[in-house]
């Protein structure tokens, strides 16, 4: 509670801030209402863990910071036809792949950045092919990179589609698109062009793949359950079931590892890799989400086996490639493999290991010319392992205590918070404050605007 003497000390400061705060409030009111705002502090319906960080506040602050860094590295308007795109890195001359747009749209909807989401989706629509799906590779100047790049990649389009469903749940009909209509059309295009008729096998793309070649890392059963309910097409449940049927046949019975590519019978696909490498590593991330959200038993069985494989190796010794029987074929300790190993731990019950692999995920971040893939998966997994990746299709945001302004995180909003925020702004040191509580206007920055709004809150 704020005492009368405290109010007097702040009154002159507050009155000086009223004009700037009124401008700020007008700007905030003009943006679309977010029905499910970040941070989520979610408790997943299934599993022992939702947040592996030492505290929810620490986890929230971490992902906010990582998100800003990720955007700085991978969001650009250069070569984006007037919109925004996700660029890769120097190793590919900063090109764009549709997979990156899938990740970028998912991240922007989870962080509640509607303008960025709309700009990314406008870029997607520029490059929709004749099947209504995104051409998979575009150069840094905005040109499709040859005839082989016109086709679509299934993992990208299913991520784009589910992000549109989530956008509908978050923002309704506000913004530049009717997200509901866009989502239904996109999902139907995927089903018609990327699901093999009669078998329910997820194809590799809109023009190739099926029973003869499929990719387990493209299997997104949690998405398919959403697609089924959202569109009324129960065929998507058959697709989800088929994914586990194929994975059961392809995975090694001792290690639990799945291959990059296989046939629907689980055997090697002609001309494709059969190791647990940079495609296959994503399988347990997608499967773990299916367990956390829907409690799918097969997902837990598969993830627990892969997690046990990594646990036996040791979280600090994880390398970036194995045969499915467990023989090491590469020697790098990368964000791709460490982060997806952390995702697999979410289905288990070994808290010591889960905490250790999560902390290793926080620690290991790729640098140099090869940063896009690993650091993007790491960003996705950090959201998931900090309780900030709930199922936005079914999630109901629970009322939370209003802690905005409790800068020093002591459970009270008082003069100490004013002092703590002032010190943080002047010294540019935020390690001793709650960034979530200090960010009064939820813009991701700690600055004089937050200071002014905190003073108004104290007066009230």
Curated annotation (Swiss-Prot):
Post-translational modification summary for this protein: There are two forms of the cellulase. The shorter form lacks probably the C-terminal reiterated domains.
Top-tier EC class: hydrolase
EC nos: 3.2.1.4
Biological process terms in GO annotation: cellulose catabolic process
Record flagged with keyword Membrane: no
Pfam families in alphabetical order: Dockerin_1 (PF00404), Glyco_hydro_8 (PF01270)
This protein's record includes keyword Endoplasmic reticulum: no
Keywords (A to Z) from UniProt: Carbohydrate metabolism, Cellulose degradation, Glycosidase, Hydrolase, Polysaccharide degradation, Signal
Superkingdom of the source species: Bacteria
GO function terms (MF aspect): cellulase activity
Catalytic activity from the UniProt record: Endohydrolysis of (1->4)-beta-D-glucosidic linkages in cellulose, lichenin and cereal beta-D-glucans
This protein's pathway: Glycan metabolism; cellulose degradation
Positions of the Dockerin domain: 400-460
Signal peptide (UniProt feature, chain positions): 1-32
Active-site residues, Swiss-Prot/TrEMBL: 99 (proton donor), 155 (nucleophile)
InterPro entries: 6-hairpin_glycosidase_sf, 6hp_glycosidase-like_sf, Dockerin_1_rpt, Dockerin_dom, Dockerin_dom_sf, EF_Hand_1_Ca_BS, Glyco_hydro_8, Glyco_hydro_8_CS
Cysteine disulfide links: none
Assembly notes: Monomer.
Protein family per UniProt: Belongs to the glycosyl hydrolase 8 (cellulase D) family.
Function per UniProt: The biological conversion of cellulose to glucose generally requires three types of hydrolytic enzymes: (1) Endoglucanases which cut internal beta-1,4-glucosidic bonds; (2) Exocellobiohydrolases that cut the disaccharide cellobiose from the non-reducing end of the cellulose polymer chain; (3) Beta-1,4-glucosidases which hydrolyze the cellobiose and other short cello-oligosaccharides to glucose.
Name of protein: Endoglucanase C
Gene, per the UniProt record: celCCC
């Amino acid at each position: 509670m704020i005492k009368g003497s405290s109010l007097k000390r702040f009154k002159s400061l507050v009155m000086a801030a009223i004009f700037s705060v009124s401008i700020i409030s007008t700007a905030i009111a003009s943006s679309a209402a977010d029905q499910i705002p970040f941070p989520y502090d979610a408790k997943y319906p299934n599993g022992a863990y939702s947040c592996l960080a030492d505290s929810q506040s620490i986890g929230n602050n971490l992902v906010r910071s990582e998100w800003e860094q990720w955007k700085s590295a991978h969001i650009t308007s250069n070569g984006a036809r007037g919109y925004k795109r996700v660029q890769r890195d120097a190793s590919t001359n900063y090109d764009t792949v549709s997979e990156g747009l899938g990740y970028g749209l998912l991240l922007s909807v989870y962080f509640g950045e509607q303008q960025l989401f709309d700009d990314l989706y406008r870029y997607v629509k520029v490059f929709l092919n004749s099947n209504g799906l995104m051409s998979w590779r575009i150069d840094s100047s905005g040109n499709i990179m040859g005839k082989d790049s016109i086709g679509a990649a299934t993992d990208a389009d299913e991520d784009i589609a589910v992000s549109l469903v989530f956008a509908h749940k978050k923002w309704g009909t506000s913004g530049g698109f009717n997200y509901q209509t866009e989502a239904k059309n996109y999902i139907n295009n995927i089903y018609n062009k990327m699901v093999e008729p009669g078998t329910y096998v997820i194809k590799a793309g809109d023009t190739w793949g099926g029973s003869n070649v499929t990719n387990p890392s493209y299997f997104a059963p949690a998405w398919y359950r959403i697609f089924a309910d959202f569109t009324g097409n129960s065929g998507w449940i058959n697709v989800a079931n088929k994914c586990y049927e194929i994975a059961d046949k392809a995975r090694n019975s001792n290690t639990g590892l799945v291959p990059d590519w296989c046939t629907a019978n689980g055997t090697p696909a002609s001309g494709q890799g059969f190791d647990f490498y940079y495609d296959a590593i994503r399988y347990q991330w997608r499967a773990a989400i299916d367990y956390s959200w829907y409690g799918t038993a097969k997902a837990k069985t598969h993830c627990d086996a892969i997690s046990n494989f990594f646990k036996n190796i040791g979280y600090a010794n994880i390398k970036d490639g194995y045969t499915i029987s467990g023989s090491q074929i590469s020697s790098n300790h990368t964000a791709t493999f460490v982060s997806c190993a952390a995702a697999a731990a979410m289905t288990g019950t070994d808290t010591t290991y889960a905490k250790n692999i999560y902390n290793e995920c926080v620690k290991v971040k790729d640098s140099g010319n090869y940063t896009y893939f690993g650091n993007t998966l790491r960003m996705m997994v950090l959201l998931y392992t900090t309780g900030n990746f709930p199922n936005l299709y079914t999630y109901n945001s629970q009322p939370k205590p209003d802690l905005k302004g409790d800068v020093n995180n002591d459970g009270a909003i008082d003069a100490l918070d004013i002092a703590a925020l002032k010190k943080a702004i002047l010294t540019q040191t935020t390690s001793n404050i709650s960034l979530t509580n200090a960010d009064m206007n939820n813009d991701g920055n700690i600055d004089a605007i937050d200071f002014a709004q905190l003073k108004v809150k104290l007066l009230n």
